[in-house]
From Swiss-Prot:
Top EC category: transferase
Protein name in the entry: Galactokinase
Annotated stretches, region: Disordered: 1-27
Organism in which the protein naturally occurs: Streptomyces lividans
Residues that, per the record, bind Mg(2+): 130, 161
Gene that produces this protein: galK
Catalytic activity: alpha-D-galactose + ATP = alpha-D-galactose 1-phosphate + ADP + H(+)
Active site positions, chain numbering: 173 (proton acceptor)
GO molecular function, one term: ATP binding
Job of this protein: Catalyzes the transfer of the gamma-phosphate of ATP to D-galactose to form alpha-D-galactose-1-phosphate (Gal-1-P).
């Protein structure tokens, strides 16, 4: 079925089992079943966690942050804690160092650390590899006895990515990586981080969810992602609401009419409002046991991302078109867009046929072979707890 994503090992000097280390954190990547580009609009999302990244961490009293990644062919990087500042680092180290900056900015007096990272989350695949790189605060939380809860760590990681790295991402990735449970999808209200764990055991129902990494890379900080976010904020301002999640689905036509000739903004608003409704529809279908019917909702979601939000690409469209022609139950792109991955819902018996059809289509188009693997919902870095929409966020580490 193509390549598998396994559990990484923080081997060598950073081994999680080594006596010299004093902490080990685990954080997951994620796939998002439905709810794309809704998190920074205070809407609903529904991610599940993928296999973990591992970080081995030890505390240093010297104010030096020493970073090493098993996935980067380079010597360890040493940074002075006092020199950490937004826009000071544009390499992969910006993600873990940004979290230390955010923790210190929030008033937590930390010294330094040795950090060794290992990951199987593909970079640029739309699977939250950046959030996985922020694994270290989970171990730091224990090492320094900070007593921060999962949702607080998620907020700090988001601030690190927004301010320190310069990527205008929402809160979904960080919360999913921290709070997802095995065998479940996380129904998350990104406005207040209230959440509900929805059972999502496809194997028990004779189905599988495949992730197809097109190997086309993207970068959120290169402009297009930010343009969409700015357009959504403009739409909310024109409609007189705090965020687009405040536009009821039943009032969408009236809202679009109020936007007049702002065609680009109209498209963005239409996607966000209809996507929120799609998330709620998928939740209802899963809770009623109508799991196969979510495939049609995934198809709708891809059309909206392609035609209204305009963040798909030829490689992603090739995956979804080929999969649907090969008897897939549903498919759509996932992640920030402009490359990355698609998810494909299939009957278990059709996994090999659909995988081969996609691989053959890429070969015929002269493209690099896609990376195909099964998405089995895993536990993230911390268990999630069910809370009501009006209650306080409740994912505890």
């Amino acid at each position: 079925m193509g390549e598998a994503v396994g559990e990484p090992s923080a081997s060598g000097s950073g081994s999680c089992t080594g006596r010299s280390r004093r902490g080990c954190g685990r954080r997951a990547g994620r796939e998002n079943l439905i709810g794309e580009h809704t998190d920074y609009n205070d809407g609903f999302v529904m991610p599940s966690a993928l296999p973990h990244q591992v970080a081995a961490v030890s505390r240093r009293e010297r104010r030096i942050l020493r970073l090493h990644s098993a996935d980067v062919d380079a010597d360890p990087v040493e940074l002075r804690v006092a020199d950490l500042a937004p826009a000071s680092d544009k390499s992969w180290t910006a993600y873990p160092s940004g979290v230390l900056w955010a923790l210190r900015e929030a008033g937590h007096e930390l010294t330094g650390a040795d950090v060794h990272l290992a990951s199987t989350v593909p970079s640029g695949a739309g699977l939250s590899s950046s959030a996985a790189l922020e694994v270290r605060p989970l171990a730091m939380n224990d090492l320094y006895a900070l007593a921060l809860r999962g949702w607080q760590l998620a907020r700090l990681c988001q601030r690190a990515e927004n301010v320190y790295v310069g990527a205008p991402v929402g809160i979904m990735d960080q919360t999913a990586s921290a709070c997802c449970r095995g065998g479940h999808a996380l129904f998350l209200d990104t406005r207040d981080l209230s959440q509900r764990q929805i059972p999502f055991d496809l194997a028990a129902e004779g189905m599988r969810l495949l992730v197809v990494d097109t190997r086309v890379k993207h970068s959120h900080s290169e402009g297009e992602y930010g343009k969409r976010r700015a357009g959504c904020e403009k739409g909310a301002a024109l409609l007189g609401v705090d965020a687009l999640c405040d536009v009821p689905y039943a009032d969408l036509d009236a809202a679009l009419e109020r936007l007049g000739d702002e065609e680009e903004v109209r498209r963005l608003v239409r996607h966000v409002v209809t996507e929120d409704e799609r998330v709620e529809r998928v939740v209802a279908l899963l809770e009623s046991g109508d799991t196969r019917r979510i495939g049609a909702v995934l198809v709708e979601g891809h059309a909206s991302l392609r035609d209204d939000f305009r963040i798909s690409c030829p490689e992603l469209d090739l995956v979804v078109d080929t999969a649907l022609a090969s008897a897939a139950l549903g498919r759509r792109m996932t992640g920030g867009g402009f490359g990355g991955s698609a998810i494909v819902l299939v009957e278990a018996a059709a996994v090999d046929a659909v995988t081969k059809a996609v691989e053959d289509a890429f070969a015929a188009a002269g493209l690099k072979r896609p990376r195909v693997f099964e998405a089995v919902p895993r536990r993230g870095a911390a268990p999630g707890l069910t809370v009501s929409r009006a209650a306080s966020p409740a994912c505890t580490p």
